[in-house]
């Protein structure tokens, strides 16, 4: 031990060492600032309360441990290796690139981080609809190593997720135990217990799904049984002849049920007096029911007939209104036709009278000619009854006399002038 009064002499450091230390501190501070600025650089979009923080912690551990490692990132973050051996080789190469003094520490850290990564894979498998965020291209050269490491961790997560899905599908098809699946699908030895937990979780999910299906089938069966029991129960209805299904009422169903309950109750009673009283009560009630049903049926029939008569009356009333409108429209035409009819009737009567007169006149002339032929030497005598005929015959003679008088008067005028 050194005495208290003495101070340890500081080792002399060269300017190159100081500069390298300053540059390292600057790079670390710039990395921290870049990590704070570029928060959306994570490949998967998880909620804040999920286990994605483990992925961030893995990236920070890799920052502290592997400042000099460089990886070539894949074409996209969801790249899958063709074979499990390729994945194990790649993991072996990445592990061999670390310095030998830090391999033990790295393996212990990765075993804890891979468990948290697989838990985050569970969440991402439940939400397959999430999309990847593009990695920003505007980051500086200092941030390139960090982004490559994060892409590498995302690649590991995606490969483990696809391997878990493949192994679960093969286990469902072949129905093999989960131990053989986990032994085939694990690459590094530290990830085996976490993958076994994953398989157990998937098996529990499949069991719960099967239980849900079984309960759904049971519900379907119970529903079908209930429907079958409902269909097996037949409802008896009392309906008289000529009754329609639309006229069925509550009493039509109550009466058969009343008869059924009466029979059941009568079988349980042993006293004759009670049976007689129940029988009389049953008969009276049944008669009342039947009377009410008949009266209700009669009432429905009367209502139906009344409705039919009302509809017929309404139709006839409508037709009467139409006829009245038509009569009002044809009334002037009727008047015109009536006047024409009266005129034609008068003409017909006048023509009939004229024809009768002419026939009588012809008969009279025929009689006169016959008498004159039989007695030609007898002188004709005319009485007062034949005066109109004589005037009619003398009209021509009177006309000739007046004509001669006119001629004589004109000749006298001419002579006087001359």
UniProtKB/Swiss-Prot annotation:
Residues 180-193 have a biased composition (Polar residues). Expressed at high levels in the testis, fetal liver, thymus, bone marrow and at lower levels in the lymph nodes, placenta, colon and spleen. Present in all cell lines examined, including B-cells, T-cells, epithelial cells and fibroblast cells. Expressed at high levels in glioblastoma cell lines. Phosphorylated by PLK1 at Thr-78, creating a self-tethering site that specifically interacts with the polo-box domain of PLK1. Component of the CENPA-NAC (nucleosome-associated) complex, a complex that plays a central role in assembly of kinetochore proteins, mitotic progression and chromosome segregation. The CENPA-NAC complex recruits the CENPA-CAD (nucleosome distal) complex and may be involved in incorporation of newly synthesized CENPA into centromeres. Plays an important role in the correct PLK1 localization to the mitotic kinetochores. A scaffold protein responsible for the initial recruitment and maintenance of the kinetochore PLK1 population until its degradation. Involved in transcriptional repression. This is Centromere protein U. The modification Phosphothreonine is found at residues 78, 98, 110. It is found in: Cytoplasm; Nucleus; Chromosome, Centromere, Kinetochore. Keywords: Centromere, Chromosome, Coiled coil, Cytoplasm, Host-virus interaction, Isopeptide bond, Kinetochore, Nucleus, Phosphoprotein, Repressor, Transcription, Transcription regulation, Ubl conjugation. There is a cross-link at residue 185 (Glycyl lysine isopeptide (Lys-Gly) (interchain with G-Cter in SUMO2)). Residues 1-11, 124-133, 208-224 have a biased composition (Basic residues). It holds the Pfam family CENP-U. One of its GO terms (cellular component) is cytosol. Changing residue 78 to D: Failed to enhance the PLK1-dependent degradation. Residues 12-42, 145-165 have a biased composition (Basic and acidic residues). GO terms for biological process: chordate embryonic development; chromosome segregation. Residues 1-76, 88-227 are annotated as: Disordered. It comes from the Eukaryota. Belongs to the CENP-U/AME1 family. Component of the CENPA-NAC complex, at least composed of CENPA, CENPC, CENPH, CENPM, CENPN, CENPT and CENPU. The CENPA-NAC complex interacts with the CENPA-CAD complex, composed of CENPI, CENPK, CENPL, CENPO, CENPP, CENPQ, CENPR and CENPS. Interacts with MLF1. Interacts with PLK1. (Microbial infection) Interacts with the N-terminal domain of Kaposi's sarcoma-associated herpesvirus latent nuclear antigen (LNA). A motif (Nuclear localization signal) lies at residues 6-23, 303-320. The keyword DNA repair does not apply. Residues 297-356, 397-417 form a coiled coil. The modification Phosphoserine is found at residues 108, 111, 116, 120, 136, 139, 141, 190, 194, 232.
């Amino acid at each position: 031990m050194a005495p208290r009064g003495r101070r340890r002499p500081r080792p002399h450091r060269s300017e190159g060492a100081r500069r390298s230390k300053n540059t390292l501190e600057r790079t670390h501070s710039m990395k921290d600032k870049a990590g704070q600025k570029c928060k959306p650089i994570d490949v998967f979009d998880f909620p804040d309360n999920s286990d994605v923080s483990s992925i961030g912690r893995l990236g920070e551990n890799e920052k502290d441990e592997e400042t000099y490692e460089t990886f070539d990132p894949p074409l996209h973050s969801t790249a899958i290796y063709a074979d499990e051996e390729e994945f194990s080789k790649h993991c072996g190469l990445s592990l061999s690139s670390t310095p030998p003094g830090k391999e033990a520490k790295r393996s212990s850290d990765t075993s804890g981080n891979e468990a948290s990564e697989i838990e985050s894979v569970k969440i991402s498998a439940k939400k397959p609809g999430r999309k990847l965020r593009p990695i920003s291209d505007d980051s500086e050269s200092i941030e390139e190593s960090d982004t490559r490491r994060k892409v590498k961790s995302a690649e590991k997560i995606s490969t483990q997720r696809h391997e878990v899905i493949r192994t679960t599908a093969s286990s469902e098809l072949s129905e093999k135990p989960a131990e053989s699946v986990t032994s085939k699908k694990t690459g590094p030895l530290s990830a085996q217990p976490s993958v076994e937990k994953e398989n157990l979780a998937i098996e529990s999910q499949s069991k719960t799904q099967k239980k849900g299906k079984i309960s759904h089938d049971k519900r379907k069966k119970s529903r079908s049984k209930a429907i079958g029991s409902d269909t097996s129960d037949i409802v008896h209805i009392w309906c008289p002849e000529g009754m329609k299904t639309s006229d069925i009422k509550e009493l039509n169903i109550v009466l058969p049920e009343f008869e059924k309950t009466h029979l059941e109750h009568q079988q349980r009673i042993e006293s004759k007096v009670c049976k007689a009283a129940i029988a009389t009560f049953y008969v009276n009630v049944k008669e009342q029911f039947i009377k009410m049903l008949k009266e209700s049926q009669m009432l429905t029939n009367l209502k139906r007939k009344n409705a039919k008569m009302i509809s017929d009356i309404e139709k006839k009333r409508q037709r009467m209104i139409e006829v009245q409108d038509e009569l009002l429209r044809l009334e002037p035409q009727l008047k015109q036709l009536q006047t024409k009819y009266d005129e034609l009737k008068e003409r017909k009567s006048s023509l009939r009278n004229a024809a009768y007169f002419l026939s009588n006149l012809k008969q009279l002339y025929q009689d006169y000619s016959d008498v004159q032929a039989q007695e030609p030497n007898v002188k004709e005598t005319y009485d007062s009854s034949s005066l109109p005929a004589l005037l009619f015959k003398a009209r021509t003679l009177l006309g000739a006399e007046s004509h001669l008088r006119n001629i004589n008067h004109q000749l006298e005028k001419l002579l006087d002038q001359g």
